């Protein structure tokens, strides 16, 4: 497990996260864009790939999410995360800026916050 992975998520929760990302109206992709979205406080949910090398690229993201009170989750691979976001290329991180279904997102955030407690 990578150093920046603070908790493990089930396959079911990973699939639910991918669904929320796929249904999102607007996303930011890549570690730099995600960092900016979190720092500005516009991110509703952040998803980080677990296979990023070197790990330092995304290691700061869970820390700033905790500081800003933004929920975050993990994807098993960069490829899976890119595919969920509708991209043809892998991506290290995604920030959902405008959700597709607010209820879906709220339910997922509650489950993720329960894992961190």
From Swiss-Prot:
It catalyses: Endonucleolytic cleavage of RNA, removing 5'-extranucleotides from tRNA precursor. Its main location: cytoplasm. Keywords: Cytoplasm, Endonuclease, Hydrolase, Nuclease, Ribonucleoprotein, Ribosomal protein, RNA-binding, rRNA-binding, tRNA processing. Its EC number is 3.1.26.5. InterPro entries: eL8/uL1-like, Ribosomal_eL30-like_sf, Ribosomal_eL8/eL30/eS12/Gad45, Ribosomal_eL8/Nhp2, Ribosomal_eL8_arc. It comes from the Archaea. It is an enzyme of class 3 (hydrolase). Pfam families: Ribosomal_L7Ae. Optimum temperature is 36-38 degrees Celsius in the absence of L7Ae, 48-50 degrees Celsius in presence of L7Ae. GO terms for molecular function: ribonuclease P activity; rRNA binding; structural constituent of ribosome. The keyword Nuclease applies. GO terms for biological process: translation; tRNA 5'-leader removal. Multifunctional RNA-binding protein that recognizes the K-turn motif in ribosomal RNA, the RNA component of RNase P, box H/ACA, box C/D and box C'/D' sRNAs. Part of ribonuclease P, a protein complex that generates mature tRNA molecules by cleaving their 5'-ends, this subunit dramatically stimulates RNase P activity. Belongs to the eukaryotic ribosomal protein eL8 family. This is Large ribosomal subunit protein eL8. It comes from Methanococcus maripaludis (strain DSM 14266 / JCM 13030 / NBRC 101832 / S2 / LL).
